[in-house]
């Protein structure tokens, strides 16, 4: 058998894998990396094939352009760049691969700052760079690969795919635009100014690639159209705000209020009770007129300032349009408008739910329009505490600066009533309200009529029923809440499927508040803990030895059993066998104290310690020592005659002696005499016991003591006291075993060699 098969102690698979050899037959020595390194030119040749780096002009003059190797490829890329600038937005990956636009402030680069490693990594296709006319942006594009036709088709295909796959984002936070604005004639989606900016930025490709052509590119014309349309859009916006129709509501409300006040004044003059109300209404009307005049003056000054700023911005844009195709003022104004329009989006949820705390301390909210201001003015007419004219003017200025649509907020205010909660129109709640009310937009006439109808209500009715409406609305809300709560409780209680477990709730509450006993105990009527665990279930000290080993043989039947019982030192001296050792079972705590010799403590009050010691020594000497054993003598005839005589026991009333009026010395003397008489009294009990035992012999009378004193196991115990007192060590155990073996050998050798009686005699110990 082969040696390798014999040594296979593990599994066959692992042993085979460990013994297998690989000769490298499946290895392809001709690696592609070697061919690539061989085919690549050297560094010197690579530097010769590369074009010279562009020389940057630091004076913002005309930059000399470097000629390309192929003019047709440049024209094709120019057309493609124009298509990109026309409005097709690439995905992020395509923009990173084809066009890189730097939005940060550009630091002018020198030829030394250009990384050579990026040029060395792509020897066949290098990047050419050319600065924009303003010298602030650098656009890089790759040269086409040698196979031009295939690359052109691939580029066209990628452009078409990007057009189809580019999602057209929905317009965010736009309710409806009914303002007379002109639509921009471009492929850009409406409501996205970032895409306009990207289109104008991407239009720079045409100028950066081909600066030799005198013809303006498509992107330039489109960017100019975007700028002109943006300017027209802003002009139309401000013209729209200058229209007097926007503030027609205030004039209508004012006229209606004046008419109603004149009618009410004629009625109130006749009634003396309403004269005070008329005076208050006149004062409120005067305050309202003053507030409206201040609002108008502030509004006119605000609009004129905004128009003046816009004209200056337009003039600066016209001057800078020749040097830069991308207008910086346009981006600033558009970004300001976007920030003001979407200012609330930056708010967090907690900030957006902070409502107006008070009329005088709260700041005006951004995004409120003229209708909301008119609503606030009328509410201030009803309430005595009105906002100041400066706050209202500031609110108006924020309305114009925010750029929100007029009719957009008018729809919101038309749906809000006095009982509704006026939420913020910016931030988190703006989008929620816009989504809910997007499908419920009203026409211009309806919205205006609704606002006019709500504003032209009678001032008298509002003053009289203001507090009543508030109280009624609160009462109605409370009633509806109570009804809903009662109905829910009724349905839950009366339903057959589910009922509230009131007992469990009550028990749980009572258990938490009550003083509960620990588990296994209860409290009796006195409040004391009572253990419910029976004594048989309580754990006791378990003996380390079995009950057979530690059993106390109180009445041995044979001498050998007695000897083994005494030799069982584990039973006597092991503290773990408390349950089985006799004598410890009794409760010593219940026993009375041991008797003491009273004579030792009679004169204990004396301070002489030496004298007390002498008396104790003398008492111990004179103390009678009881005889060993029980020695009962046989009674004589005289003693037997005494038993027939009546011998009464002397008695005295101790209570009478103690409660007498005599002195303490006399009381003590009487008690001592009574004690002496009791000591001298002979009841004849010993004589009676001896008489009852006169028929028994001496051996029978002394049986108990003699049997215990002369027992065999007691004698062996005293004889083997040295062996029993030794510790159970290994040496002592070995010696005991050897002694037993020698003793057994003697028995076997001394016995007669009869097979039948040999083992039986050893077991019966008859040797």
Swiss-Prot record:
Underlying gene: FYV8
Source domain of life: Eukaryota
Cysteines paired by S-S bonds: none
UniProt feature, compositional bias: Polar residues: 119-138, 372-386, 447-458, 485-495
Originating organism: Candida glabrata (strain ATCC 2001 / BCRC 20586 / JCM 3761 / NBRC 0622 / NRRL Y-65 / CBS 138)
Family assignment from sequence similarity: Belongs to the FYV8 family.
Function per UniProt: Involved in the resistance to unfolded protein response (UPR)-inducing agents.
Region entry Disordered, spans: 20-408, 439-501, 506-525
Biased composition annotated in UniProt, kind: Basic and acidic residues: 35-48, 150-171, 180-196, 219-240, 285-299, 391-402, 459-484
Protein name: Protein FYV8
């Amino acid at each position: 058998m082969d040696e390798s098969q014999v040594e296979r102690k593990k599994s066959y698979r692992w042993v085979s894998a460990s013994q297998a050899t690989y000769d490298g037959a499946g290895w392809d020595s001709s690696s592609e990396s070697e061919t690539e390194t061989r085919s690549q030119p050297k560094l010197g040749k690579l530097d010769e094939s590369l074009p010279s780096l562009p020389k940057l002009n630091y004076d913002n003059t005309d930059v000399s352009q470097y000629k390309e190797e192929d003019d047709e490829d440049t024209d094709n890329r120019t057309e493609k760049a124009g298509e990109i600038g026309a409005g097709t937005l690439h995905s992020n990956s395509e923009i990173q691969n084809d066009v890189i636009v730097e939005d940060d402030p550009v630091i002018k680069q020198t030829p030394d700052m250009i990384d050579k490693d990026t040029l060395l990594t792509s020897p066949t296709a290098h990047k050419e760079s050319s600065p924009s006319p303003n010298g602030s942006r650098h656009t890089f594009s790759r040269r086409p690969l040698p196979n031009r036709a295939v690359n052109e088709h691939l580029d066209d295909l990628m452009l078409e795919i990007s057009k189809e796959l580019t999602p057209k984002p929905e317009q965010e936070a736009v309710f409806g635009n009914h303002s007379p604005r002109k639509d921009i004639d471009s492929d850009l989606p409406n409501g996205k100014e970032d895409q306009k900016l990207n289109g104008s930025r991407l239009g720079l490709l045409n100028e950066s690639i081909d600066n030799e052509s005198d013809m303006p590119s498509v992107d330039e014309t489109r960017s100019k159209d975007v700028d002109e349309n943006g300017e027209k859009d802003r002009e139309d916006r401000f013209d729209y705000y200058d229209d007097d129709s926007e503030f027609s509501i205030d004039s209508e409300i004012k006229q209606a209020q004046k008419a109603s006040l004149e009618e009410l004044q004629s009625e109130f003059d006749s009634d003396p009770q309403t004269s005070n109300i008329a005076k208050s209404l006149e004062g409120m009307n005067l305050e309202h007129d003053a507030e409206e005049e201040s609002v108008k003056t502030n509004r006119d000054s605000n609009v004129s300032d905004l128009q003046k700023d816009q004209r200056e911005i337009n003039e600066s844009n016209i001057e800078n349009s020749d040097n830069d195709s991308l207008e910086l003022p346009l981006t600033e104004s558009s970004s300001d408008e976007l920030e003001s329009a979407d200012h609330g989006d930056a708010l967090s949820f907690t900030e957006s739910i902070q409502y107006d705390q008070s009329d005088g301390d709260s700041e005006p909210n951004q995004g409120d329009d003229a209708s909301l201001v008119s609503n606030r003015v009328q509410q201030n007419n009803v309430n005595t505490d009105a906002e100041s004219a400066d706050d209202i003017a500031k609110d108006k200025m924020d309305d114009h600066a925010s750029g929100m649509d007029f009719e957009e907020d008018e729809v919101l205010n038309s749906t809000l009533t006095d009982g509704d909660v006026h939420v913020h129109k910016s931030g988190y709640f703006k989008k929620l309200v816009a989504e809910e009310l997007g499908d419920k937009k009203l026409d211009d006439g309806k919205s205006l009529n609704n606002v006019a109808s709500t504003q032209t209500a009678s001032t008298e009715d509002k003053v009289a029923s203001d507090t009543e409406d508030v109280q009624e609305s609160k009462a109605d809300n409370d009633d509806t809440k109570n009804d809903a709560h009662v109905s829910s409780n009724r349905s839950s209680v009366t339903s057959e499927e589910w009922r509230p477990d009131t007992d469990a709730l009550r028990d749980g509450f009572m258990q938490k508040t009550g003083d509960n006993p620990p588990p296994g105990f209860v409290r009796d009527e006195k409040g004391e803990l009572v253990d419910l665990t029976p004594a048989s279930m309580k754990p006791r000290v378990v003996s380390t030895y079995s009950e057979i080993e530690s059993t106390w043989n109180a009445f041995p039947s044979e001498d050998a059993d007695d000897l083994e019982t005494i030799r069982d030192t584990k039973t006597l001296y092991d503290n773990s066998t408390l349950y089985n050792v006799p004598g410890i079972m009794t409760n010593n705590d219940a026993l009375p104290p041991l008797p003491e010799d009273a004579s030792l403590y009679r004169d204990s009050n004396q301070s002489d310690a030496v004298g007390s010691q002498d008396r104790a020594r003398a008492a111990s000497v004179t103390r009678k020592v009881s005889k060993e054993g029980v020695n009962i003598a046989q009674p004589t005839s005289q003693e037997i005659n005494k038993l027939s005589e009546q011998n009464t026991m002397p008695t005295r009333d101790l209570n009478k002696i103690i409660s007498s009026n005599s002195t303490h010395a006399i009381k003590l003397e009487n008690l001592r005499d009574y004690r002496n008489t009791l000591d001298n009294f002979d009841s004849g009990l010993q004589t009676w016991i001896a008489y009852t035992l006169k028929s028994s012999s001496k051996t029978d009378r002394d049986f108990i003591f003699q049997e215990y004193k002369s027992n065999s196991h007691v004698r062996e115990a005293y004889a083997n006291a040295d062996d029993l007192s030794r510790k159970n060590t290994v040496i002592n155990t070995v010696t005991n075993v050897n002694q037993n073996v020698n003793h057994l050998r003697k028995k076997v050798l001394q016995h007669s060699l009869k097979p039948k009686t040999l083992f039986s005699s050893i077991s019966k110990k008859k040797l």
